[in-house]
């Protein structure tokens, strides 16, 4: 029986030979998707960008695997679902991975081993890690076909559990586990700006400010006239960051943790909103929660000035819930700022709908 062959012309050729997909019992792989990722990586030139930031201490005449190939192999393994470096000892002979690194699938030499990957992963020092972060920021800036007029940068962190005794691991009481708490920065289009691996502790205001300064200053070097807005939850509403934003012309809109002082400012509004919702329930079960806003100037002992605070009071079947945000934006009403500007951040964790 003749074997059907599907030619994928969009895949990059290997050694001037076109890549085809066919039924073949010999030399099979379950990871053909890495060829698609390889095309993306080549277009971004990501492995070469990062390799250029590293100093290779190996003797040139004894190098079998180039730095960019090692990094490329490691990245492709991660996106294919093999985050453990130990998997490289098996994947190094996988035909799909060989083709992704421009090697013949059968006769080509094996890729690098796990010890080589581990040595390269521990090669970078602080200055080289900083250069790699700058390379990622350059990659982000290069992704724009035209100079942007406005950028909104979303700051957030995620808990990354560990399954061993990795360096810098730390116990986090909130998540009740060991791991890391990396900070991620995305823009509103979903582009990754930067991710920073760090220990599993709540970042301090000084740490956040240092990161924000480096990111913003790098973007402004490329786009001097761009308007930048920072957005994040209450972890990032620290006085150091807000004061720096105000001094350098940055916009910000952050979540704000509640306290007794803020609660006193909205106590009357909470009572009225809860009573109105209860009255509606008595007449007819409402289809939506009832939401009201209060816009006022407030402050904290650690702040050097008062700032605009918006309280969102929402009454529903579970009672009255109040959230706060703080911002230096002055050109919008409270409802629009909260619903259209703040709640758009973190698509996976903020799905609040206007009442």
Task: Give the positions of each predicted feature.
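Short, well-ordered coil/turn segments that N-cap beta-strands
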Residues: 149-151, 224-228, 250
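Acidic/histidine-rich, metal-coordinating catalytic segments
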Residues: 156, 227-237
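Generic recognition of stable, solvent-exposed alpha-helical segments in well-folded globular domains
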Residues: 32-35, 68, 83, 87, ...
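Short, surface-exposed basic-aromatic patches at helix termini and helix-loop junctions that form
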Residues: 242-251
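Flexible loop/turn segments at secondary-structure boundaries
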Residues: 97-98, 160-162, 202, 235-240, ...
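Dynamic "connector" segments at or just before major functional cores
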Residues: 1-202, 209-222
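An anionic, glycine-rich sequence signature occurring as long contiguous blocks
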Residues: 2-19, 23, 251-354
């Amino acid at each position: 029986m003749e074997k059907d062959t599907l030619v994928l012309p969009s895949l990059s050729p290997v050694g001037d030979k076109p890549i085809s997909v066919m039924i073949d019992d010999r030399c099979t792989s379950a990871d053909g998707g890495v060829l698609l990722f390889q095309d993306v990586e080549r277009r971004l030139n990501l492995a070469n960008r990062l390799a250029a930031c590293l100093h290779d201490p190996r003797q040139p005449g004894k190098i079998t695997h180039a730095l960019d190939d090692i990094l490329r192999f490691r990245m492709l393994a991660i996106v294919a679902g093999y985050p453990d470096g130990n998997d490289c000892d098996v994947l190094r002979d996988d035909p799909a991975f060989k083709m992704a690194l421009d090697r013949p699938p059968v006769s080509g030499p094996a890729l690098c081993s796990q010890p080589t990957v581990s040595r390269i992963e521990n090669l970078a020092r602080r200055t080289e890690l900083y250069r790699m972060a700058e390379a990622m920021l350059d990659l982000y800036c290069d992704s724009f076909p035209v100079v942007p007029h406005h950028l909104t940068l979303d700051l957030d962190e995620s808990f990354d559990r560990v399954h061993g005794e990795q360096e810098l691991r730390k116990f986090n009481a909130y998540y009740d586990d060991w791991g890391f708490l990396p900070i991620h920065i995305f823009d509103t289009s979903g582009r990754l700006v930067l991710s920073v691996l760090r220990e599993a502790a709540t970042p301090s205001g000084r740490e956040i400010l240092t990161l924000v300064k480096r990111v913003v200053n790098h973007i402004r070097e490329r786009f001097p006239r761009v308007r930048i807005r920072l957005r994040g939850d209450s972890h990032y509403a620290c006085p150091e960051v807000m004061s720096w934003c105000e001094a350098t012309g940055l916009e910000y809109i952050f979540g704000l943790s509640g306290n007794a002082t803020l609660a006193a400012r909205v106590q009357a509004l909470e009572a009225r909103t809860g009573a109105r919702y209860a009255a509606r329930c008595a007449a007819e079960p409402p289809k939506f929660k009832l939401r009201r806003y209060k816009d006022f100037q407030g402050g904290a002992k650690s702040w050097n000035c008062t700032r605009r605070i918006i309280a969102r009071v929402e009454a529903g079947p579970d009672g009255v819930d109040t959230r706060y945000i703080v911002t230096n934006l002055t050109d919008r009403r409270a409802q629009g700022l909260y619903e259209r500007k703040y709640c758009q951040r973190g698509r996976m964790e903020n799905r609040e709908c206007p009442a």
